[in-house]
Swiss-Prot record:
This is Large ribosomal subunit protein uL11. Part of the ribosomal stalk of the 50S ribosomal subunit. Interacts with L10 and the large rRNA to form the base of the stalk. L10 forms an elongated spine to which L12 dimers bind in a sequential fashion forming a multimeric L10(L12)X complex. Keywords: Methylation, Ribonucleoprotein, Ribosomal protein, RNA-binding, rRNA-binding. Forms part of the ribosomal stalk which helps the ribosome interact with GTP-bound translation factors. Belongs to the universal ribosomal protein uL11 family. The lineage of its organism: Bacteria, Pseudomonadati, Thermodesulfobacteriota, Desulfovibrionia, Desulfovibrionales. The gene is rplK. SMART domains: RL11. Pfam families: Ribosomal_L11, Ribosomal_L11_N. GO terms for biological process: translation. It comes from Oleidesulfovibrio alaskensis (strain ATCC BAA-1058 / DSM 17464 / G20) (Desulfovibrio alaskensis). The keyword Metal-binding does not apply. The keyword rRNA-binding applies.
Length: 140
């Protein structure tokens, strides 16, 4: 018999830096999950991606066990890193904060492909280029 799923928890945590403080502790604690066990497992799985923000989907079960799936970093984080900017523009249509090449956009699209709804690479490239435009980053 399959375990009874009681919740799906979505978080974005710094790779290799999960700890019991908010937002991780309260999110897991309210479902009765072992916070330290999750933190150790997450940090072990993401230690090679230090410095990146990693989205994670945690599935909590009725017997207080859990499983989790890590996803690729958000496109906005990858674009900001490629353009060497701290954050996107507050006025993306007026003020440009940086630029990326089409090759960099293609690399990000290839990396993000499993998490995007695009059917093929050109569609994924358009999605990433749109994200760049909405952040005030020029695509050259």
């Amino acid at each position: 018999m399959a375990k009874k799923e009681i919740a799906k928890i979505k978080l974005q945590i710094q790779a290799g830096a999960a700890n019991p403080s908010p937002p991780v502790g309260p999110a897991l604690g309210q479902h009765g999950l072992n916070i330290m066990e999750f933190c150790k497992a997450f940090n072990a799985r993401t230690q090679d991606q230090k410095g990146m923000v990693i989205p994670v989907v945690i599935t909590a079960y009725a017997d207080r066990s859990f499983t989790f799936i890590t996803k690729t970093p958000p496109a906005s984080v990858l674009l900001a890193k490629a353009a060497k900017v701290a954050k996107g523009s507050g006025e993306p249509n007026k003020t440009k904060v940086g630029s990326v090449t089409m090759e960099q956009v293609e690399e990000i699209a290839k990396l993000k492909m499993p998490d995007l709804s695009a059917k093929d690479l050109p569609g994924a490239v358009k999605t990433i280029a749109g994200t760049a435009r909405s952040m005030g980053i020029d695509v050259k």
